[in-house]
Amino acid sequence: MNPVLAVQDLRYELSGDGRALVDGVSFTVGAGETLVLLGRSGSGKTTTLKLVNRLLVPTSGAVLIAGEPADAVAATQLRRRIGYVIQEVGLFPHFTVAANVGLLPRLEQWPEDRIARRVRELLVLVGLDPDTFAARFPHQLSGGQRQRVGVARALAVDPPLLLLDEPFGALDPITRVELQREFRGLQGRLGKAMVFVTHDVREGLLLGTQIGLLDSGRVIFLGSPDEFRASTLPAVRQFMEAA
């Protein structure tokens, strides 16, 4: 069986100077697995996610979704197979919570009653009472509530793959811990393949089934959380000492 996501020798160069922001990156992620990409700022984590989602086009290498080359699929269709959650959430400010969560199903021309059921189901899943929150606007929500809505929206059309880029990074420490705990529960219930970007090693070790450490655009470590903890690689030790 093909993994949900396979990244093969991915390279991305800046046009003009040939400098690689991502260089030779390879990994696979199966259903129910969460690959955490760790690394300092500028190490290539977010660029890698954008290459998977075709927000950027790789210079060379391949991205396969369920065995199908991503570049063989229309970009709009590809993004409907991939849920994307970012730190800034990106909710439409003049849409209600229900309209934000139901946006992709509506673009997919789902019947309105099916959209309404899906919105309620997802709000319950992420811990928001639909009767309380569905009619609210993003400015009426706390940071943690907005992030929950962002996760619900990413799940709306049931994509097999979720990409999460520092989703809890802008939250206060208490809310961040709450959402990390809730996210662990969602992992087991959803069975999605996930790629989770963070610079927080404690968060990565808590949430990941695999850890990938990037440095200057290259994966210098790929293994389980226990293997990461036991590694003698100097770059890994630096991260562990900062935990």
Where would I find each of the regions flagged by the language model?
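Helix-to-loop junction immediately C-terminal to a conserved catalytic motif
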Residues: 53
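ABC ATPase NBD coupling module
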Residues: 70-83, 107, 112-113, 228-232
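Short helical segment in ABC ATPase nucleotide-binding domains corresponding to the A-loop/adjacent helical element
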Residues: 98-106, 116, 120
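Conserved ABC ATPase "signature" region
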Residues: 113-132, 185
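Conserved signature/switch motifs of ABC ATPase nucleotide-binding domains
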Residues: 139, 157
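Catalytic Walker B motif of ABC-type/P-loop ATPase nucleotide-binding domains
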Residues: 162-165
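Helical segment within the ABC ATPase nucleotide-binding domain
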Residues: 176-190
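Conserved ABC ATPase "signature" C-loop
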Residues: 216-217
